Structure formats: structure tokens, C-alpha cells
Amino acid sequence: MSVWQQGATIELRIDSLSHTGEGVGRWQDRVVFVADTVPGDRLRVRLTHVKRQYAHGKVLEVVQPSGQRVRPNCIVADKCGGCQWQRVAYATQLAAKEQLVKDAIARIGHLEPQAFLPILAAPNPFGYRNKVTYPLGRRHGAVVAGYYQKGSHHLVNLNQCPVQDPRLNPLLAALKQALQPWPIYREQTHEPGFRHLGLRIGQRTGEQLITLVLAGPLPAGLAAEAEGWLQRFQGVIGVCVNFNHHVGNRIFGDETQVLAGRPYLWEEMAGVRFQIASTTFFQVNTAQAEQLVTTLRDWIAPTGQERLVDLYCGVGTLSLPLAGAVAEVIGVEVHSASVQQAIANAQHNGINNAHFVCAKAEEWLPRYDQAVDVLILDPPRKGCDRAVLDAILHNCPPRLLYVSCHPATLARDLAHLCSTGTYQLAKIQPLDMFPQTAHVETIALLTTS
């Protein structure tokens, strides 16, 4: 039997980590990706998917563990697909993320920044998530909530999670019991019921918001049940239901209704008090969001005279903490509910120089004819629409700060922005927003040449 085929067993050493979180090793000049491994591990591996020059494998035996291998904090780390790197020492995670950003900028963007700064570590590598959304199911009659097993749609049942704020752990366990009499959605038959449980916490305020995602009509008596939860669970200030009748992987639908209490919680970040609803985008790591804002402020070095435009502004997460240092802020966001919350947040904090527009960035920016001193981009993972990048090159603000959660799309967009010679890549700053996972946040500063 040829060794390079599915089912064959090989021995190799893991040298690095990939952007998907897998360990990367080499065997006879071919690349092998192996999940749940650590750089420095020597392994015996069974090949599971084989191509000509690369393969994926499964660990059969850790022949010699790496010195960078640690015991996972999670008892289901070998099954749960939520985290990829709980076996990897935190310093090694940071080095790997830094390298992932460097590789993307060089190989995809073909760029070399004037300064590549060391990654900003998270002060708390565990217990940092202020928001979690768990798929729901029923197994042997009992409600289960958790994340999907790696590479499957089998739910790994959780009563706690080491990366979420620890104050959410008892709430998760209690709500699974409280949901026992209520209908649970069946993915195979699309039988109506609750399909996701969303928990959110203001890490600085302690306020907690429960969101049930429902496929089907609102069950009778649910509002009364929700009122009881407000009394029963300390810190819970609201219970909402989101209606999602779509078949597929979409978590939230378009309609959210408050069942009890408030439809939002308050959070404090970078000196600003934010109103955050169940489906609103807000950085999941409050402490690292503050580091992000601090870095942006330092790089802008405001004089108080600037006009700052924030594209993909959400609820004003970046705009509002920066507003006090500049003359004017304009935030642009396509989701109307987020725009309304951004306006409410500005009013609540007495910020009068921030204005928010509900529009697509690619449609608004080409029409905007005023001079922009500083432009902030914080797009979704897919990056910016080409029309946005072309409008930036036409408007040509002297300072452009791009915040990205995906190094590959960041590198692609930076390459386009620098392709005409208008901009140069001045700085790159990786930031660890998502410890224990392969995801990395990056800030890029472009200045006019």
C-alpha cells in the first residue's frame, strides 16, 4: 500500500499553526494539517483526506508532546468546535497569530509595512466573552445547549464554558432546566421550537440579557415565564425572543420582541456607556475593545480639528470614544437598529459632535463631497466592497485606519489601496481579541504618500 493515501499512518513533527487553527507539519515535502496539535509535537497520524501535495490527518498518538502543550481548561476540548487552541500555551498562540498576519500581508498583499508592532495580548485569556449564542437540541428527552462537535452537527452539551464570562455559567445551566417543558426546534424535521439561546453580559455593569431564537409561533405562557426569570436570575434585566423561520445556518431573524424587562443592556467601554440589544454587533471582548480604541486614538494623534468618518460603525463602538478628541464624527452603518442605538448612545453620553447615517458604505462614500481627515474602516470578515475602496482612493483622506478580523481580506484590501501609490502602509498592529481560537484582530494605518 502506498503511504500517501487515505488511511495510511505516518509520523511527523508539527512546525506551525494555520489560520484554521490546525497544526502544520511536513512529510517528504508534503504538507499535513492536523487538528488539536501544538508546534513541537511529534505525532503518529492517520491520513484522512489526501491530495497530491497536502493532506489532513487525525492524531493517533502523541509520540513526544511539545513543551508548548498545556492541559485544556475545558473538559470537552477534545470534542467541542468552539475553541481550537486550548492545548496551546498562550505565548505560542500570540506568536502564531502574529505570524499569520505577517504571512497574509506579505503573501496576499505583497506589502511590507514600515512598522509591524508586537501583538497586544489579552489581559484575560479566559472568561473574556461578553456574548454567546448556543444552538439548542434535545437528547434522551433533556434539553442540550452547546457548540457543534468539530466537523459535524452533533451538539456538545455544555453547562459552562471557560471562554465566556463566568457569570454566565450558572445562567446557562439553569436555563437549560427552565427550557425543559418548552418546544425545542428539530433541525432534521424543522419541527417548531427554540433553536438558539443567546446570552449577553455587560462586563462592567453586570447586566445580563437573555435572547431565545424561535422558529414558529410564540408559545402561550412564555411571557409569564420570562417575567419569572427576571425575579429568579440575579443580574438579568431583559428577556427577548427573536423569530427566525429561515432554514439554514443563519442564527438570528429580522424580528425581535421583548418578553420581559428591557430589550437591551448597558455596557461601559473606553469612557462611554453603550446600549446594546440582543442582535446588535459589539466587540465580544470588552477589555480588548478598549485596547483597540486606545491604539486608534494614539495613531490618530488628534488635534481637535479633525473630521472623522467611521464606516461600518455599528452602535458607535469606535466613533463615540473618539468623538471627544476630534471636531466631528460621522458614522455610517447599514443596519437601521444599530444606527438608532448609536444615536441613542451619543445622546445618553452627551456627545453632540457625532452624527450617524443609515446607508451602505459603498453607496454613501462616493456621494460624500466633504474633506475627511481620518477614515476608520471596520468591515465584516468579507472585507470591503470594491466600490468603497475606489471611493476612498477618490476622496483620499490623509489617514486611514483599517480594523479587520480576517488577515486575508485585510491584505487583499490593503493591496488595492496601496496599488496606485496614493497610500503607503505605515503600521500593522495585531491584537488578540479571541484567545484560545485562531482568530486575530488587526489594525492597519495607511497614510498618503
Swiss-Prot record:
GO terms for molecular function: 4 iron, 4 sulfur cluster binding; metal ion binding; rRNA (uridine-C5-)-methyltransferase activity. The keyword Signal does not apply. Residues 3-61 form the TRAM domain. It holds the Pfam family tRNA_U5-meth_tr. Keywords: 4Fe-4S, Iron, Iron-sulfur, Metal-binding, Methyltransferase, S-adenosyl-L-methionine, Transferase. Belongs to the class I-like SAM-binding methyltransferase superfamily. RNA M5U methyltransferase family. This is Uncharacterized RNA methyltransferase tlr0942. It comes from Thermosynechococcus vestitus (strain NIES-2133 / IAM M-273 / BP-1).
